[in-house]
Amino acid sequence: MERLTDEDGVHARVRQRNVLCGAGKYLTFQLSNEEFGIRVLKVREIMGLQEITAVPQTPAHIKGVINLRGKVVPVIDLRLKFGLAAADYTQRTCIIVTQVQGESGPVLMGIVVDGVSEVLNLAGSEIEDTPDFGEEYSGGYLLGMAKVKGKVKILLDIERVLSTQDLHNLNSMLR
């Protein structure tokens, strides 16, 4: 029989806290053949694809900006941010407008996704910690993995999806 150490107990409590903190409502969406989710409280609006004005000398995943009722909102393509193959935009492609914390306060940011699925109310028991993928991969933007109807949905911390440099670039675009 395997003996548990104090360290094992600490890790178990941390995992339990992470799972309980992850419980709540998530907007789920598709990228390629995968399903992702972000906390509903971070979502401000879901809109159909509209014209995006490109901004020169930005990384490829920063598509540009949109005019949202007189407010300039930066837009990123999550496919490109995650290193997935680029795809043509379709009728289902949409922009999820989220609110993230920028250098000088809250910032609206649009994310282009292949399509929105549904809002799920997830219990802590439906969420598992992110697996350990090894040293090469930090996965700091993953909240966990939700098990729903025999499928896995990847839960994202939208605040951490963008790197510090991305947030700096977005803040510069808005000045």
Residue ranges and their predicted role:
Residues 1-175:
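An acidic, low-aromatic, low-complexity terminal/linker signal
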